[in-house]
Amino acid sequence: MNVDFIAGINNLGEKIYTCEPFKTSFQNPFIVALIITAVVLVIFFAICNPPVDKKRKTKTAIYVYICIVALLFLHYYVLNHQLNEIYNKSNMDVIVSSIHDKYKGGDEIIPPISPPSVSNELEEDQPKKIPAGPKPADSKPAADSKSLVPLQEVIMPSQYNN
């Protein structure tokens, strides 16, 4: 019976911890900063009881407000810095995974294909050679020349190879 009672308490604790509002409240950095500030203020007032004198009471209140503002800025800076690091790491993971997806593994890099206008400009700059003899109309192209590859096969070779 005692073991069942302890197991029930542990199960209840797990249910409370996994409850959505409780879980997200401790993931919110602003709420964490407020909790830490409240704990520091409680400790501050427990150690230093404010004096009864009115002038000293005002000075103590000013010091308390300065401490509150300083702690909030400190928590904001530290938590914002940590969140920025997490955000930058997650962005780098997204960038790296998109590069791997683009090149399908990252090892094989597909060279960019130059547009046809660039190759035409290069050919126009060179002087054209005119053959010396007459060319028969039924002549076949030389065996050295390669046949043209369809453009789709150049862009997406993986679809045609499979």
Curated annotation (Swiss-Prot):
Membrane-crossing segments per the record: 28-48, 60-80
Upper taxonomic lineage: Viruses, Varidnaviria, Bamfordvirae, Nucleocytoviricota, Pokkesviricetes
Gene Ontology CC, one term: virion component
Stated name of the protein: Transmembrane protein B169L
Topological relation to the membrane, as annotated: Multi-pass membrane protein
Domain of life per record: Viruses
UniProt region (Disordered), positions on chain: 112-149
Keywords: Glycoprotein, Host membrane, Membrane, Transmembrane, Transmembrane helix, Virion
Glycosylation sites: 88
UniProt record similarity statement: Belongs to the asfivirus B169L family.
Localization of this protein: Host membrane; Virion
